[in-house]
Amino acid sequence: MIDYTAAGFTLLQGAHLYAPEDRGICDVLVANGKIIAVASNIPSDIVPNCTVVDLSGQILCPGFIDQHVHLIGGGGEAGPTTRTPEVALSRLTEAGVTSVVGLLGTDSISRHPESLLAKTRALNEEGISAWMLTGAYHVPSRTITGSVEKDVAIIDRVIGVKCAISDHRSAAPDVYHLANMAAESRVGGLLGGKPGVTVFHMGDSKKALQPIYDLLENCDVPISKLLPTHVNRNVPLFEQALEFARKGGTIDITSSIDEPVAPAEGIARAVQAGIPLARVTLSSDGNGSQPFFDDEGNLTHIGVAGFETLLETVQVLVKDYDFSISDALRPLTSSVAGFLNLTGKGEILPGNDADLLVMTPELRIEQVYARGKLMVKDGKACVKGTFETA
């Protein structure tokens, strides 16, 4: 028999639901961190002691899934003082991020996969959903167990591996190292019931995606398990990325890169090229270092990349590129969940996790629920991380 009091039911009434598909005006019933029901009219007395939230005139959509975040900090390329700090929970939730994938960057000397794993687990305890990629720019990969395959297979939060290619900061890996790494991630994923993906940080080298094509020629890892990211950082790379997506690959556009290919422009161009939105994702590269230069190219100061560009990209897609709200949301919701095989994420459906955003008609975030818990109210975090000030 259900203990309705313990279940803590919440009924979200009257919002325009984008699940992300347009469902019109709907009610959503939530309990125990899950979506229990979605219908055009759910009576408020369907269960006793139900908290009713009137969302008339507002939009309800899935929480954002940001698959590229430097959870324990990034940077360091301009010396020790440019190492960015760990991310705070509220920076994620106030940007609408309810699920996150952490990773390392250039620095795998003073930062370690073990520390990233601890941070990932901490964020799960603080209320959102978090996973990680093992490895970093360096190849062979820095790992926890000594093996990419073991990390992915047996460590609960590890779902794949990351490396860098076509970048002066990479380890200049040859095709056989890349193929072995991707194959280990793939097999580890099979053994552990994980996606087993390989994420490639893309640099500005004119080689662009050629190392990935060489990998595909020399091993049998499916193209669907390989993800080039930062593909909008230069025009030739972006053009190659579109061709990669036409061949069946998925591409990741970085929201914090505003030129030469702005994120909304990149998504729009992909759609114009006939690429399904299911194979286009958007991520922030958040919490990494963000350098600023003067007119002579001198470094003036370094900030920390934020997450606001995710929502801004959605807004620009709707306002400037005539995207439906449904399609504008997909690269941050269902497309990411599909690529990473994140069961229960990315769609508002019965049985899925209650990761929900409440937005105004102008697409401003008002409330954020993560696994059914209210994390943001009136646009401000009402739940803070362990060491955040109230």
Swiss-Prot record:
Q: List ligand-binding residues for substrate.
A: G75, G76, E77, T106, Y137, R169, R233, S289
At the top level, the lineage of the source is Bacteria
Named from the GO MF annotations, one term is: identical protein binding
**InterPro entries reported in the protein's UniProt record:** Amidohydro-rel (IPR006680), Isoaspartyl-dipeptidase (IPR033826), Metal-dep_hydrolase_composite (IPR011059), Metal_Hydrolase (IPR032466), Metallo-dep_Hydrolases_sf (IPR050378), Pept_M38_dipep (IPR010229)
Q: Any idea which positions bind Zn(2+) 2?
A: K162, H201, H230
Annotated active site: D285
The cysteines covalently paired via disulfide bonds are none
Compartment list: Cytoplasm
Q: Which residues carry this modification: N6-carboxylysine?
A: K162
| Annotated Gene Ontology cellular component terms | cytoplasm; cytosol
Outcome recorded upon mutating R169M: Loss of activity
When this gene is knocked out, what is seen?
No observable phenotype. Does not result in reduced stationary phase or heat shock survival. Approximately 31% of the enzyme activity present.
Post-translational modifications reported in the UniProt record: Carboxylation allows a single lysine to coordinate two zinc ions.
Set out the biological process GO terms recorded for this chain's protein: proteolysis
Q: Which CDD domains match?
A: Isoaspartyl-dipeptidase (cd01308)
Keyword terms, alphabetized = Cobalt, Cytoplasm, Hydrolase, Metal-binding, Metalloprotease, Protease, Zinc
What is the regulation of this protein's activity?
P-hydroxymercuribenzoate causes a slight inhibition (8 to 17 %). Iodoacetamide, o-iodosobenzoate and ammonium persulfate do not inhibit the enzyme activity.
Give the EC number(s) under which this enzyme is classified.
Answer: 3.4.19.-
- Which residues does Zn(2+) 1 bind? H68, H70, K162, D285
- What family, per the record? Belongs to the peptidase M38 family.
Known role? Catalyzes the hydrolytic cleavage of a subset of L-isoaspartyl (L-beta-aspartyl) dipeptides. Used to degrade proteins damaged by L-isoaspartyl residues formation. The best substrate for the enzyme reported thus far is iso-Asp-Leu.
Question: Which named protein is this?
Answer: Isoaspartyl dipeptidase
